Amino acid sequence: METNKQTILIVDDDPDMQQLLQQVLQVAGYEVLCADNANDGLRLALSRAPVLAILDIQMPEVTGLTLAKSLVEETAVPFVFFTSTGRQDEVMQATRLGAIGYLTKPINPDQIIPFVSVSMVRARDLQQMKAKAETARAIGAAIGLLMAKHPINESQAFQRLHDHARAKRAKIIDVARAMVSAQENINLM
């Protein structure tokens, strides 16, 4: 079994669409997981952590939009929509939920791989931006803690943080996170 294949989750109640997507993606070298309802789709997303989820919006019981909200709240799985409607309100709701892309059915099979490839690059870029923002927040918070404790400016606080990380042979982000976590624990007491 090949372990370096990227996994894509398809959640669509239409078996023909599911089969089309699965065939095209497998030929392109992806491992494909399929679910015909949102609840099974969420279970697969939680247990298998696919690199991308392809969701239909209109499904019985739980919609793809509701599933997307659950993916945002419970996983880090990026998602796109392939749906039979192109209603503006659904497009706006999908965008607000964080959809990476949106295509309306019927889908030309030749569009699937380029759409998925671009969506995955976009998802990776967004994840990197989030990681950088989190790093900046943690370092900024640690600098703020140092400035509150010592009569120093921002540049001096950063230098102290940098020197401390170097002395510990640790990454500056790890030292910053430890400082912030320690302060949060002190605040809970």
Can you annotate each of these PLM segments?
Residues 43, 65-75:
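Short amphipathic alpha-helix used as the core "switch/output" element in two-component signaling
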Residues 130-189:
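C-terminal output/effector regions of signal-responsive regulators
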Residues 29-36, 44:
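Short hydrophobic/Thr-rich beta-strand motif most characteristic of the beta2 strand and flanking loop
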Residues 18, 60, 83, 87:
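The feature encodes the CheY-like receiver
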